[in-house]
């Protein structure tokens, strides 16, 4: 399995969770296969917690600042947040910059060009098929090796003065640990008002973690940073070391139990019967969401996220 194919796996999971009623996403139908299989309840639940928690932070970030905000998505693939957020907050308030491998960029660009509902969200745009890029007022897509950002900068224009959050959904973990560290430090140094949201597995050395790594390795997928950051506390210390002022890192079980409102939990739990409760709890403890921020961004956003404690 090529790393580029992991985006298709994630797409199938999001599509299943959307069709089952966990997630509201009117744009995923343009990307998902017409005959997408239903995922087991435990997978739908994990996809929901992942999507809800990331949306929770990013949307509160958008709502915490006036004027234009910027989201830089590493390994964005078929992620539909750009369309969901622009339709809700308006193109004048958001700039998305997305990076991925060439096949994933081309797949997204061609899907955008096919569907008016997607084109309307981003407005006028310019496409370079040979380079795998799309540039518009609210969305830029680049086929670009993110490791080169540290040495060569961004391939297009980036406004370093805008409040900015970098998003990595299982992307940084594919880099060598020193490469991931260099990139995170670069982001922290270059943006005055910034944060980073990172979703990735943890606890790779226990029995479940070893099984998870073996399954991924059998498919040709190696998470190179997994063994470096075993716990949520190690993830927290990692980003403090990068220079961020405030960091919170929680596993998915904690997020489900303490972040998600009771009524929302009741709604999602009524969708499907989850028989594998112990398996879910074990799985949820092996995935972590980290949110790190500069002091000025944290002080602004924490008013919208009073339940987050560092």
Swiss-Prot record:
It comes from Schizosaccharomyces pombe (strain 972 / ATCC 24843) (Fission yeast). GO terms for biological process: methylation. GO terms for molecular function: protein C-terminal leucine carboxyl O-methyltransferase activity. The keyword Methyltransferase applies. Belongs to the methyltransferase superfamily. LCMT family. Its EC number is 2.1.1.233. Signal peptide: none annotated. S-adenosyl-L-methionine binds at residues 50, 75, 100, 145-146, 169. SUPFAM superfamilies: S-adenosyl-L-methionine-dependent methyltransferases. Methylates the carboxyl group of the C-terminal leucine residue of protein phosphatase 2A catalytic subunits to form alpha-leucine ester residues. This is Leucine carboxyl methyltransferase 1. It catalyses: [phosphatase 2A protein]-C-terminal L-leucine + S-adenosyl-L-methionine = [phosphatase 2A protein]-C-terminal L-leucine methyl ester + S-adenosyl-L-homocysteine. Pfam families: LCM. GO terms for cellular component: mitochondrion. Keywords: Methyltransferase, S-adenosyl-L-methionine, Transferase. InterPro entries: LCMT1, Ppm1/Ppm2/Tcmp, SAM-dependent_MTases_sf. It comes from the Eukaryota.
């Amino acid at each position: 399995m090529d790393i580029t194919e992991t985006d298709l796996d994630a797409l199938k999971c999001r599509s299943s969770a959307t069709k089952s009623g966990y997630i509201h996403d009117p744009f995923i139908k343009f990307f998902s296969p017409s005959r997408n299989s239903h995922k087991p309840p435990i997978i739908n639940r994990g996809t929901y917690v992942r999507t809800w928690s990331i949306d929770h932070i990013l949307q509160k970030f958008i709502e915490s600042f006036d004027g234009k905000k910027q989201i830089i998505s590493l390994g964005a693939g078929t992620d539909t947040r750009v369309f969901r957020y622009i339709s809700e907050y308006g193109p004048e308030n958001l700039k998305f910059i997305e990076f991925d491998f060439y096949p994933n960029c081309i797949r997204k660009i061609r899907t955008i060009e096919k569907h008016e509902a997607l084109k309307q969200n981003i407005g006028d745009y310019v496409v370079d098929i040979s380079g795998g890029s799309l540039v518009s007022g609210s969305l830029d897509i680049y086929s670009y090796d993110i490791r080169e950002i540290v040495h060569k900068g961004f391939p297009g224009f980036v406004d370093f003065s805008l409040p900015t959050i970098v998003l990595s959904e299982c992307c940084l973990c594919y880099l060598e640990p020193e490469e991931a560290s260099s990139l995170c430090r670069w982001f922290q140094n270059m943006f005055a008002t910034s944060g980073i949201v990172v979703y990735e597995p943890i606890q790779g050395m226990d029995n479940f973690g070893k099984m998870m790594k073996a399954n991924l390795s059998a498919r040709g997928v190696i998470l190179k940073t997994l063994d470096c950051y075993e716990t949520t506390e190690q993830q927290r210390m990692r980003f403090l070391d990068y220079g961020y002022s405030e960091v919170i890192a929680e596993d998915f079980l904690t997020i489900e139990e303490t972040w998600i409102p009771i009524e929302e939990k009741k709604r999602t739990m009524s969708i499907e019967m989850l028989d594998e409760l112990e398996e879910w709890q074990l799985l949820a403890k092996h995935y972590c969401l980290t949110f790190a921020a500069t002091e000025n961004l944290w002080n602004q956003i924490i008013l919208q996220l009073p339940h987050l404690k560092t």
